[in-house]
């Protein structure tokens, strides 16, 4: 899981990263979990 840094993420990447943080056990956000 990558570090959450909204200042360096595009909106789509931020949303994806947030989803990974909310659902770390599920492959809901492109398999970054």
Swiss-Prot record:
It comes from the Viruses. To E.coli ylcH. This is Uncharacterized 3.7 kDa protein in rusA 5'region. It comes from Enterobacteria phage 82.
